[in-house]
């Protein structure tokens, strides 16, 4: 979902977002943040939820429109709630317990589940040949007891219990997935689909957003300027150029069919924290594909700026 800093929003005269698309509004330019799915499993689930909820092409288009407003892509998932809590940026895309625990800890923040969301269980288990297998099983059993479930309501934890009865002891306004239809699993999450293209989706996000955030922001900033100048004017040429610029930003360097191809996904084995880390696996098929994607993305963002600037000149 989305968490926000109430003081930050008030100081910058910004409304609290309710849906994913709200975060694509130009008013949030430079006021939002998110971690990269390649650095956070929960963030990956958020991205995949958008792709499955809206469809691959439309989902990526929405994701890039949202990302264009980012002030930063944080190095770790914890960096998002930290950024919102401290007021470094106003709104962050997070897993729910980051927002709920911040509220419980007294930070001036809010949190909302957008309509397109999914519920993902947190797993617990005993590893094979565990040195303390008996105690591990006892711990799991304890977590499922009423007392163990109530621990999840602790202000510093704030996870959703699996026992419906536990919610009777939850604080006021605490989300209850068993009763509140607004936080139901709106997306029937396809785990196998997500698993099959996991590394590809992470690489694609990094190439289009993480490593090219400045370029993406520049492209959308130019488009925002053109749209603002156009306003309600009747200028077909400018409208066409702006539409073409937006299409260039939204365009993908890969089809959905290719992204779901099992054999193609096998080439994505390497992870990198920085763009230049691609040098570590230079010569591999993955490096070649990512380089092709990068050229496609840069060319499109650059041409989008040119289209937007041409639109401005025509007004």
Over which residues does each language-model region extend?
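Structural recognition of the beta-strand scaffold that forms the well-ordered cores
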Residues: 1-3, 31-35, 90-94, 110-113, ...
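Extracytoplasmic ligand-binding site segments that recognize negatively charged/polar headgroups
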Residues: 1-74, 78-85
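A bilobed periplasmic-binding-protein/Venus flytrap-type ligand-binding module shared by bacterial periplasmic
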Residues: 3-8, 119-133, 151-152
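Periplasmic-binding protein-like
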Residues: 62-67, 104-130
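A ligand-binding cleft/hinge motif common to bilobed small-molecule-binding domains
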Residues: 85, 90-108
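Mature extracytoplasmic/periplasmic domains
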Residues: 127, 132-193
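C-terminal structural cap/anchor segments
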Residues: 167-237
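C-terminal non-catalytic accessory extensions
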Residues: 226-315
């Amino acid at each position: 979902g989305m968490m926000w800093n109430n003081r930050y929003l008030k100081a910058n005269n910004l409304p609290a977002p309710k849906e994913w698309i709200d975060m694509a509004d130009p008013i949030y330019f430079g006021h939002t943040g998110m971690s990269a799915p390649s650095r956070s499993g929960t963030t990956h689930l958020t991205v995949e939820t958008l792709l499955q909820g809206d469809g691959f092409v439309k989902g990526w288009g929405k994701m890039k429109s949202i990302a264009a407003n980012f002030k930063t892509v944080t190095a770790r998932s914890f960096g998002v709630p930290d950024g919102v809590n401290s007021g470094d940026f106003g709104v962050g895309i997070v897993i729910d317990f980051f927002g709920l625990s911040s509220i419980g800890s007294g930070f001036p923040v809010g949190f909302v589940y957008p309509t397109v969301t999914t519920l993902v269980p947190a797993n617990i288990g005993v590893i094979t040949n565990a040195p303390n297998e008996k105690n591990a099983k006892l711990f799991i059993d304890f977590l499922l007891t009423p007392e163990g479930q109530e621990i999840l309501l602790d202000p510093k934890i704030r996870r959703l219990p699996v026992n419906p009865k536990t919610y009777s002891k939850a604080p006021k306004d605490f989300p209850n997935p068993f009763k509140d239809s607004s936080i139901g699993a709106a997306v029937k999450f396809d785990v196998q689909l997500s698993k099959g293209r996991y590394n590809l989706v992470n690489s694609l996000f990094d190439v289009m957003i993480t490593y090219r955030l400045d370029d993406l922001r520049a492209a959308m900033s130019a488009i925002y300027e053109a749209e603002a100048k156009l306003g309600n004017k009747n200028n077909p040429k400018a409208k066409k150029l702006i539409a073409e610029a937006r299409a260039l930003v939204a365009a993908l360097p890969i089809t959905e069919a290719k992204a779901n191809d099992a054999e193609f996904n096998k080439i994505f084995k390497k992870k990198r924290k920085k763009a230049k880390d691609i040098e570590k696996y230079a010569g591999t098929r993955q490096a070649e594909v990512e380089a092709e994607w990068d050229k496609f993305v840069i060319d499109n963002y650059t041409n989008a700026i040119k289209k937007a600037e041409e639109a401005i000149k025509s007004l």
